[in-house]
Structures are given as C-alpha cells and as structure tokens.
Amino acid sequence: MIEKVNMYHPDKVADRIAGAIVDYAYSLVPNPRIAVEVLVGHGHAAIIAESSVILERQVVEGIVGRIAGLSKGSVKLVQAPQDSHLAANQASGFRCGDNGVFAAKWHPGYERATTLAAEYGSIFIADGKYMFDFHRNAATICQSNATESDIRAVATEFENVTINPLGAWTGGTDADTGATNRKLGSDQPFCNPNGLHGKDLSKADVSISICVNAISRKLGGAFVKAYCSIGDEEVDLFVDGVRVGRLEFSEAVEFARSYITDLGGFEKFAEYGMRWDYEHD
C-alpha cells in the first residue's frame, strides 16, 4: 500500500511555498543558506526563514498569493540570519550541516503512484489524497471538489476503487492547515524523518536524501543507507548492509543541484517529492 497526496493538499501547498522561497533565494546568490518553515491555513500564512540573504517581503507575498491565493495582508513573515556557528561550518565549502541517518529503497510502485497522483492532480485542481494497493489492484481515492462519476472515469485501471468514504468534501487550506515537511511518507519510496523541503542544498537532509534515492533506483531497489555528522566532508555509504565507501558531500550537493535543476526547481520538487520523469545518472 502506498500513500500519495497531490500538489493541492494543504501540506504540499506549504511545501511549495517553502520551495518557491528557496528558488527565490537561489535567484539572488549561487549558494544561499536558507531554511524556511511555512504554516498556511484559514486565510493566513506564517513564514519563518533563517537565511543568509534578505528576502523582499513583496516577493514572498507574491509567492504566497500565487500558490495559496492569499492576499499580502494575510502573510506574516519573520526573517532571521543563519546561526553564526552553522554559518561558520559552511564558510570554507560544503560540509554536512547536521547529524543524519538516511535510507532509501526504491521500488516501481512508488513511481507508479507518483505518476498517478500527478495525473489526478492535473485533472482535479483541488486537494486530493490517495492510497494505492497495486498487488490487489485496489485504490482509495479521496478527491475534493469532484463527483464520484468523474473520479471513476479517471481511475479506470483499478478493479476495486473506494471513493470519498465520508462523502463529498471541499478540502484545501480552509479545511485543514498545511505545514512544511509533513508529507514525507508521500514524498519518498522509503519514509525518512529528514525534511526535504524549504532548505538549500548544503542541508544533508536534501542532498543526501536525493543521492541515496538515486543510488537505490540505479541499483534496482537496493537498500541504501548513509550516515553523517555535522561538519563532515564525507558521508559513509552502505548498500544492503555492506559499507561501500564514502561519498564526498560536495559531490552530493552538485548531484542534487543538477537533479533539482532538471526537475524545474525546489518548488517543482515540492509538488510530488522524489520523482524520476527523466534519466539522471
């Protein structure tokens, strides 16, 4: 069973806002240091950004308006400089910004679920949450602002489909408050607690997570783990329990940079999490 939400789920709205703000920071300097937390719901958005760059309020308000449809008066923005100790750690180059344990185990069902969620999200421009059981050819589709007949017309590949168990619903940020990095189980094939969104590439949570998922996929679903401590310039890498060497963190950053660029940016990454719509070696 695989859970997936579409890009209009409140938590993904928060992720997309955070991702767009990170994109904005990268438009200002090549390697910003930024971490963004977003809480959005019921006509309000609260944003806290720890950043090495100054974010123009009107740009941030424009991002929130575009993604969440909120007016600029409903946005509370708090900016703070990056902690001096954390800044010093990255002053001379890319080094792991935190302790971390990362794991990935790719499987084709996740990619199929991601493709379906994106397809449904392109048809129903509204909050949606899905459960896919490809072994039983079954699905539970909770899709707001859509009729049962419209949903059944789309979900034709499943023999057993449960649609909106509680009946029709409206969803969105007026029904449920969204928060950054609260849908990590939907965003990667093997759930980890490492936050993927609202962070620059110097954060191991982002770069190492992307790398281990890519390695696992390339190896056909091997169980890949990585360990790092704050300040490390290399990361211990294990495949199916066997240590295979160390990965230069700077190389992980550049791989992740290329991945994010090819995908279309951090906002695009935030829509559906890890995805491989193209070949990236």
Predicted features by range, described:
Residues M1-A35, A270:
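N-terminal, positively charged regions that mediate nucleic acid binding
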Residues I2-Y8, E37-S51, T140-C142, D187, ...:
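Short glycine-rich or small-residue beta-strand-to-loop segments that form or flank ligand, phosphate
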Residues P30-G43, D127-D133, A222-L237:
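Short edge beta-strands and adjacent turn/loop segments
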Residues V38, Y130-N145, D174-N192, E233-V244:
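Short beta-strand elements
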Residues V38-H44, V64-A175, E271:
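Glycine-rich, mobile lid/loop segments that gate access to catalytic sites or pores
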Residues E56-K76, D150-F158, V239-F266:
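A glycine-rich helix N-cap at a beta->alpha junction
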Residues Q143-S216:
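Glycine-rich anion/phosphate-binding loop at the beta-strand->alpha-helix junction
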Residues G221-D281:
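Internal helix-turn-beta structural module
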